[in-house]
């Protein structure tokens, strides 16, 4: 029996693969407006501080291909083909959709490598893919909109936190800060669920890890005139120290799924500068990256969508 072909569109933010690519990447983020020399040098300096370039590009590719392999092992009746689509670097989301069209893919499942839904993130990615696919007569795209409460995602972070706490002597003097990328405050007034979803993720992980001292914070805010969601994790660290005298800070950037600039610089450098100033200890559990536990998590999420599509098709065919 011939296997049914299904596209697996894995979308992510993207990152420059060399320092020479930083300007084009930054310009794309700024909707075609080149950054000032000062802003460009600042960003390049951050990349240099983490070793020259972010590991994100390599990790994202590994996540996408391992997920595809896992799906092909789970569903022997389907043949999944991986298409990587990035927001700000090649291969762009549009490149992936056009390639699926050329390859004759008629049905696709899309997943964004970000757990929390926002109009700025997951919706924007899926809208770009679906809009172009409709324009060119490409595949029908079934989108996964969010997975912030996926049990295997929660258990991954709970296990990491439990492991981290084995390194801490005075656990009563430790606090966990769950964080995600800050976004403009205006999304809250518009009813965006992003903030509440992060809170829910934090509550679920805290319960699973059996921790009492935890809170949420925001990081990596953009440099724009509009106010962004706070508190920033660095300010939050200082406030928590002053109010509670915590001696150990465990940073869990659960809004991200891989090591990249925002984690390796904004957390591992900037937050550690703050904890060092406070004479407190800095901890940051391992990011999911392409670890088998996280790939299993992603495969579970996509598998649920496959079964949802199959059930929907059965209902339609029986009517």
Curated annotation (Swiss-Prot):
Molecular function via GO: ferrochelatase activity; metal ion binding
GO terms for biological process, alphabetical: heme biosynthetic process
Protein's pathway: Porphyrin-containing compound metabolism; protoheme biosynthesis
Binding site for Fe(2+): 181, 262
InterPro entries: Ferrochelatase, Ferrochelatase_AS, Ferrochelatase_C, Ferrochelatase_N
Reaction equations catalysed: Fe-coproporphyrin III + 2 H(+) = coproporphyrin III + Fe(2+)
Alphabetized UniProt keyword annotations: Cytoplasm, Heme biosynthesis, Iron, Lyase, Metal-binding, Porphyrin biosynthesis
Enzymatic class: lyase
Annotated PROSITE patterns: FERROCHELATASE
Keyword NAD: no
EC identifiers of the protein: 4.99.1.9
Residue numbers binding Fe-coproporphyrin III: 13, 30, 46-47, 54, 125
Source domain of life: Bacteria
GO cellular component, one term: cytoplasm
Protein family membership: Belongs to the ferrochelatase family.
Functional summary from the UniProt entry: Involved in coproporphyrin-dependent heme b biosynthesis. Catalyzes the insertion of ferrous iron into coproporphyrin III to form Fe-coproporphyrin III.
Protein's recorded name: Coproporphyrin III ferrochelatase 2
Gene name for this UniProt entry: cpfC2
């Amino acid at each position: 029996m011939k296997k049914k072909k299904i596209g697996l569109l894995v979308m992510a933010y993207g990152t420059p693969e060399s320092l020479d690519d930083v300007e084009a990447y930054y310009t794309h983020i700024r909707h075609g407006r080149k950054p000032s020399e000062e802003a460009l040098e600042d960003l390049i300096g951050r990349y240099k501080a983490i070793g020259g370039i972010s590991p994100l590009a390599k990790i994202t590719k590994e996540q996408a291909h391992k997920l595809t392999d896992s799906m092909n092992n789970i569903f022997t009746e389907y043949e999944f083909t991986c298409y990587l689509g990035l927001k700000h670097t090649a291969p762009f989301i549009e490149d992936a959709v056009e390639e699926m069209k050329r390859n004759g893919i008629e049905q696709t499942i899309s997943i964004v490598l970000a757990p929390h839904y926002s109009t700025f993130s997951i919706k924007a990615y899926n809208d770009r893919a679906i809009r172009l696919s409709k324009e060119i007569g490409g595949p029908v795209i079934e989108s996964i909109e969010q997975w912030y409460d996926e049990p295997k995602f929660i258990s991954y972070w709970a296990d990491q936190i439990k492991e981290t706490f084995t390194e801490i002597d005075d656990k009563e003097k430790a606090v966990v800060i769950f964080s995600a990328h800050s976004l403009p405050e205006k999304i809250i007034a518009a009813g965006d669920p992003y903030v509440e979803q992060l809170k829910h993720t934090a509550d679920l992980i805290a319960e699973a890890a059996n921790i009492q001292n935890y809170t949420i914070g925001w990081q990596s805010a953009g440099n724009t005139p509009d106010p962004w969601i706070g508190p920033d994790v660095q300010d939050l660290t200082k406030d928590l120290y002053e109010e509670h005298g915590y001696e150990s800070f465990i940073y869990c950037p659960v809004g991200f799924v891989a090591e990249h600039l925002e984690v390796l610089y904004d957390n591992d450098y900037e937050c550690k500068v703050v904890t060092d100033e406070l004479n407190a200890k800095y901890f940051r559990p391992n990011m999911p990256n392409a670890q088998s536990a996280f790939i299993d998590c992603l495969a579970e999420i996509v598998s649920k969508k496959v079964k949802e599509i199959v059930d929907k098709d059965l209902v339609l065919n029986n009517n």
